[in-house]
């Protein structure tokens, strides 16, 4: 091979070598670019995944908070219903007892009137009078067990909560505005007025 041909051959080999190096460099750059893109994509997916996890955690917290609030409201409503039911039962019981007690008052009045009208001087009437007295005493003992009390005190200060003034009189023996006499007894039920005592009051 001549010197000229050898030079041409060497130049051709050199060009081919440079071409191969260029291709290899381009391949390496392409691989690096693809790796960088893959890493970027992976980071983006990770950020999205973390954001989704954060969103789900917030939703879970909100759901738990809503459930707790609903449970608290339900418990409060149950307690309110229980309290209202208990109050209604107590009111119904008190109303029924009060109504029943009011029905008994005329019976007590009639027994007392019968005793007042009876001839206590007549010996033949004594057994009947004693029977009336025992009946009245038993009756009063029975109603006291349910909280009924008699308002019949004299010489006490007039109390508009339990007394009803029927008349005013001058009475040197009593202080002003005091009960002189009881015309009709009053009654209370567990501290609540059933019927005021009708009284005569001193001026």
UniProtKB/Swiss-Prot annotation:
Top-level division of the source organism's lineage: Bacteria
GO CC annotation: cytosol
Keyword ATP-binding: no
GO molecular function: adenyl-nucleotide exchange factor activity; protein homodimerization activity; protein-folding chaperone binding; unfolded protein binding
Region (Disordered): 1-38
Pfam family membership, one: GrpE
Gene Ontology BP term (one): protein folding
Keyword Chaperone: yes
Regions of compositional bias (Basic and acidic residues) in chain numbering: 1-20
Quaternary state and interactors: Homodimer.
Job of this protein: Participates actively in the response to hyperosmotic and heat shock by preventing the aggregation of stress-denatured proteins, in association with DnaK and GrpE. It is the nucleotide exchange factor for DnaK and may function as a thermosensor. Unfolded proteins bind initially to DnaJ; upon interaction with the DnaJ-bound protein, DnaK hydrolyzes its bound ATP, resulting in the formation of a stable complex. GrpE releases ADP from DnaK; ATP binding to DnaK triggers the release of the substrate protein, thus completing the reaction cycle.
Protein's name according to its UniProt entry: Protein GrpE
């Amino acid at each position: 091979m001549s010197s000229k041909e050898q030079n041409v051959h060497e130049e051709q080999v050199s060009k081919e070598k440079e071409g191969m190096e260029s291709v290899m460099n381009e391949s390496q750059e392409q691989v690096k670019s693809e790796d960088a893109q893959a890493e970027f994509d992976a980071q983006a997916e990770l950020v999205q995944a973390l954001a989704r996890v954060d969103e789900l955690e917030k939703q879970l917290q909100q759901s738990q908070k809503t459930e707790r609030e609903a449970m608290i409201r339900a418990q409060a409503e149950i307690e309110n219903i229980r309290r209202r039911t208990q109050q209604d039962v107590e009111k119904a019981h008190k109303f029924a007892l009060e109504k029943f007690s009011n029905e008994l008052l005329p019976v007590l009045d009639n027994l007392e009137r019968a005793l007042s009208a009876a001839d206590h001087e007549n010996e033949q009437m004594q057994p009947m009078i004693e029977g009336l007295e025992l009946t009245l005493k038993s009756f009063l003992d029975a109603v006291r067990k349910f909280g009924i009390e008699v308002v019949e005190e004299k010489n006490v200060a007039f109390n508009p909560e339990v007394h009803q003034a029927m008349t005013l009189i001058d009475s040197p023996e009593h202080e002003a505005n005091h009960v002189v006499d009881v015309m009709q007894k009053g009654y209370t039920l567990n501290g609540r007025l059933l019927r005021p005592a009708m009284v005569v009051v001193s001026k």
